[in-house]
Amino acid sequence: VRSADLAKHGFLAPASILTESAPLNSIKGNRGIEAIAVPPDDSAFGGSLVAIGERILLGGNHSGWVLSGNQSRRFKIRRRGDFDITDADFLPNGDLLILERRFSLILGSAVRIRRISAADFTPEGLATGMILDGLDLMTADLTHQIDNMEGMAVRVDPDGTPIILLISDDNMNFFQRTLLLEFALRPEEFGVIPPPRPAAETLPRG
């Protein structure tokens, strides 16, 4: 994994080795590292990077790593419902959000956002070998306005409301779409967010 300080040097920034982790170097194929997230500076893993595999399974569960300097620490996320992980980001309070996607010829496509509490995602918690799980913030299927949701980012409105942005990849296929979805995670709804619009509803253009 290489790191470059674009803020200081722009696109001419020299890249430097962030970690030489043997587990990451040995990952092959198209189900490798899919999500990279930066924890808040004041969180348990501030100053590190978190990398999670799309479908790197260990004992049937997803694998992720906390990368800090030349050190890496592996952790596990419980795999539920045949979903793969496509992205991740952190809320300001240190909770880890996981974007998951499922595609099945029988069940169709679905997307899910899970929230893993900062109280569980700690060096002490990972040292016990615990399997992280978390709460479902949102689950949607093809009855809603979704597609191949692969990207997620979190920003914060001036009033402090976390905004979750999701984007899909159409893979240059005529039967897929590029969608940008936005959700407000309000305090009174912190345990759940409503799913996207119904699929039968026409989206506005512009």
Q: Where are each of the predicted segments found?
A:
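Sequence/structural signature of beta-propeller domains
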Residues: V1-G206
